[in-house]
Design a protein with these regions (language model features):
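N-terminal amphipathic alpha-helix/helix-capping segment at the start of soluble metabolic enzymes
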Residues: 46-77
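Alpha-helix-loop-beta-strand connector modules within alpha/beta enzyme cores
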Residues: 119-141, 176-182
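Active-site mouth loops of central-metabolism enzymes
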Residues: 74-89, 115-119, 141-143, 164
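Conserved anion-binding
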Residues: 108-112, 166-203
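Glycine-rich, proline-tolerant flexible connector loops at the mouths of alpha/beta enzymes
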Residues: 105-123
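Catalytic beta/alpha-barrel core
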Residues: 121, 138-146, 158-169, 182-193
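Glycine-enriched alpha-helix->loop->beta-strand junction motifs that scaffold or abut catalytic
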Residues: 100, 152-161, 177-183
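Single conserved hydrophobic/aromatic residue that forms the stacking wall/gate
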Residues: 2-9, 13
Length: 203
């Protein structure tokens, strides 16, 4: 809700913006306008509703285990592409924290074009990220590959990353939307901005 100060008086009122999700083509806007509690009725033209300034004009601030993302302060996520061993990830975590990073990222599961390439340390990589978090206090960010991993990620990861390859893995996005863990959604390799925002609607 947004506070509004009346120009005719010193009273401060609250304005509540309500959004209707789904097919609104049959709604009669005039029926809504006649309600004395309604100031204005307008249609959101874009297909994305939740990820839309018309529904929440205020800036979003996401709390990731005490670190705020959004608002006036810049949050920096830094770390290695792949978690390789404890010495590497703890050392990098300490270095990026010293350089001003506020979150630690590292790949435990690595999607590769070739089945013969390094696929990441997987569950062991998650354990090493947790050690680095304990050593530095930095919340951890890592990529999830499928909904089968969700329970472990919800338990251990502070910010779940959805990679470009999974931006349109809609079943995974739906499952993530049912959790209370923040999600970092990367834009797909050839996705438009609208497709990216529509993927965010699932979350």
């Amino acid at each position: 809700s947004t506070p509004i100060k009346s120009s005719a008086a010193s009273d401060v009122y609250k304005r509540q913006i309500l959004g209707v999700i789904g097919d609104t083509s049959a709604l009669d806007m005039n029926m809504l306008k006649v309600n004395e509690c309604v100031d204005k009725v307008m249609r959101v033209q874009e297909p994305f509703k939740r990820a839309n300034r018309s529904f929440h004009p205020e800036d979003s601030v996401i709390d990731v285990s005490g670190v705020k993302i959004g608002g006036r302060k810049l949050a920096v996520i830094a770390g290695p592409c792949s978690v390789e061993n404890e010495k590497q990830i703890v050392g990098v975590a300490k270095s990026v924290k010293l350089a001003g990073a506020t979150l630690l990222r590292g790949g435990a599961f690595k999607p590769r074009t070739s089945p013969y390439s390094f696929q990441g340390l997987k569950e062991e990589g998650l354990d090493l990220l947790k050690i680095a978090r304990k050593e530095t206090g930095l919340p951890i960010v890592t990529e999830i590959m499928s909904a089968r991993m969700l329970e472990r990620f919800v338990e251990d990861v502070d910010l779940i990353q959805v990679g470009a390859r999974n931006m349109q893995n809609f079943e995974l996005l739906k499952e993530l939307g049912r959790t209370n863990v923040p999600v970092l959604l990367k834009r797909g390799l050839s996705a438009t901005i609208e497709e990216w925002l529509m993927a965010a609607e699932y979350i």
